[in-house]
From Swiss-Prot:
Functional description taken from the UniProt entry: AcnR negatively controls the expression of the aconitase gene acn.
Keyword check for Coiled coil: no
UniProt keyword terms in alphabetical order: DNA-binding, Magnesium, Metal-binding, Repressor, Transcription, Transcription regulation
Amino-acid positions noted as binding Mg(2+) in the UniProt annotation, renumbered to this chain: E181
Keyword Transcription regulation included in the entry's annotation: yes
Subunit-level organization: Homodimer.
Biological process terms in GO annotation: regulation of DNA-templated transcription
DNA-binding region, residue intervals: 33-52
Lineage of origin: Bacteria, Bacillati, Actinomycetota, Actinomycetes, Mycobacteriales
Protein's name in the database: HTH-type transcriptional repressor AcnR
């Protein structure tokens, strides 16, 4: 497949990312073959790898983009509200399946894990800043360190994402989120 004349490199790069996101979400990391990536993006192998070098770099670019988007959302709304949004409109959160693939790669690929740590730190910092800001405003419980609250929320988020992405029942999850929110807030 060839790139249409007149395509700007930035547009081409973004089109590749959007198509690759769909391909990885549908087929997983291992199943996203070069042929499938070409079909999903409408771009040639040469164009894809010109922008990203290889499949892992393409996947990491998606992961970095998703971490930045999620960090922005978390800093504005908080992690529990992000989960509420996912529950209400999972289609809006197109990175859910990619996040599961990231978890799989983290478990099975030590090199990927080392590269991912930098991307995850962006999200971790956004959560910590949000928690610290709420603690300073007197909204958070003070008997538990911020790092423990962060780990707790991250653990809940991972399970929440797994449940949504695998199509498990969402019955009762809204009440679970109420419980999580209450558990990190300062008692009145």
């Amino acid at each position: 497949m060839s790139v249409a004349t007149g395509d700007k490199p930035v547009n081409s790069r973004q089109e590749i990312l959007e198509g690759a996101r769909r391909c990885f979400a549908e087929h997983g990391y291992e199943g996203a073959t070069v042929r499938r990536l070409e079909e999903a993006t409408g771009k040639s192998r040469g164009a894809i790898f010109h922008h990203f070098g290889d499949k892992e770099k393409l996947f990491l670019a998606l992961a970095r983009e998703d971490a930045a988007r999620m960090a922005e959302t978390v800093s504005e709304n908080g992690l529990v509200e992000v989960m509420r949004g996912m529950l209400e409109d999972p289609e809006r959160y197109d990175w859910l399946s990619i996040r599961l693939e990231i978890s799989k790669q983290l478990r099975t690929d030590p090199e990927f894990r080392a590269k991912w740590t930098d991307h995850q730190s962006v999200l971790d910092e956004a959560v910590r800043v949000r928690l610290a800001r709420n603690a300073d405003k007197g909204r958070m419980r003070t008997d538990v360190p911020i790092e423990v609250l962060h780990l707790y929320l991250e653990t809940v988020m991972d399970g929440f994402i797994s449940r949504l992405a695998t199509g498990a029942s969402t019955e009762g999850l809204s009440e679970v989120l109420d419980l999580v929110e209450t558990s990190v807030r300062r008692p009145d």
